């Protein structure tokens, strides 16, 4: 894997194999039995899945050496965010997404509330 040493690759692959074994050890519940029995089996299966997910996160965070908690994203103050469509925005709906324009002063069009 790019940017990693051979030793950490082996550790990561071992961790992935362990996680795969954990998930394989908890197959889907059987569809036989009464409605209540099926419901109980599904409930217990979901609880085991949650435990396996938690264990998997702990294994990966140990191997990768970082926290599984996301790093908080610093956002600019909402009162300074404006929509800037002075450039050709297009109609695809995807252009300009991901890079908000921050203007110190709001455009006069947004402040006046009247059409010209």
Swiss-Prot record:
Disordered, as annotated region: 24-49
GO CC list: host cell cytoplasm; host cell nucleolus
Stretches with biased composition (Basic residues): 36-47
GO BP, sorted A to Z: mRNA transport; viral process
Alphabetized Pfam families for the sequence: REV (PF00424)
Chief site of localization: host cell
Posttranslational modification: Asymmetrically arginine dimethylated at one site by host PRMT6. Methylation impairs the RNA-binding activity and export of viral RNA from the nucleus to the cytoplasm.
Locus of motif Nuclear export signal and binding to XPO1: 73-84
Motif Nuclear localization signal and RNA-binding (RRE) mapped to chain: 34-50
Ranges for region Homomultimerization: 18-26
Keywords noted in UniProt: AIDS, Host cytoplasm, Host nucleus, Host-virus interaction, Methylation, mRNA transport, Phosphoprotein, RNA-binding, Transport
Modified residues (Phosphoserine): 5, 8, 92, 99
GO terms for MF: DNA-binding transcription factor activity; RNA binding
Entry's localization field: Host nucleus, Host nucleolus; Host cytoplasm
Note from the entry: HIV-1 lineages are divided in three main groups, M (for Major), O (for Outlier), and N (for New, or Non-M, Non-O). The vast majority of strains found worldwide belong to the group M. Group O seems to be endemic to and largely confined to Cameroon and neighboring countries in West Central Africa, where these viruses represent a small minority of HIV-1 strains. The group N is represented by a limited number of isolates from Cameroonian persons. The group M is further subdivided in 9 clades or subtypes (A to D, F to H, J and K).
Family label: Belongs to the HIV-1 REV protein family.
Domain topic, free-text comment: The RNA-binding motif binds to the RRE, a 240 bp stem-and-loop structure present in incompletely spliced viral pre-mRNAs. This region also contains the NLS which mediates nuclear localization via KPNB1 binding and, when the N-terminal sequence is present, nucleolar targeting. These overlapping functions prevent Rev bound to RRE from undesirable return to the nucleus. When Rev binds the RRE, the NLS becomes masked while the NES remains accessible. The leucine-rich NES mediates binding to human XPO1.
Subunit structure: Homomultimer; when bound to the RRE. Multimeric assembly is essential for activity and may involve XPO1. Binds to human KPNB1, XPO1, TNPO1, RANBP5 and IPO7. Interacts with the viral Integrase. Interacts with human KHDRBS1. Interacts with human NAP1; this interaction decreases Rev multimerization and stimulates its activity. Interacts with human DEAD-box helicases DDX3 and DDX24; these interactions may serve for viral RNA export to the cytoplasm and packaging, respectively.
Function, as annotated: Escorts unspliced or incompletely spliced viral pre-mRNAs (late transcripts) out of the nucleus of infected cells. These pre-mRNAs carry a recognition sequence called Rev responsive element (RRE) located in the env gene, that is not present in fully spliced viral mRNAs (early transcripts). This function is essential since most viral proteins are translated from unspliced or partially spliced pre-mRNAs which cannot exit the nucleus by the pathway used by fully processed cellular mRNAs. Rev itself is translated from a fully spliced mRNA that readily exits the nucleus.
Protein name: Protein Rev
Organism annotation: Human immunodeficiency virus type 1 group M subtype B (isolate SF33)
UniProt lineage: Viruses, Riboviria, Pararnavirae, Artverviricota, Revtraviricetes
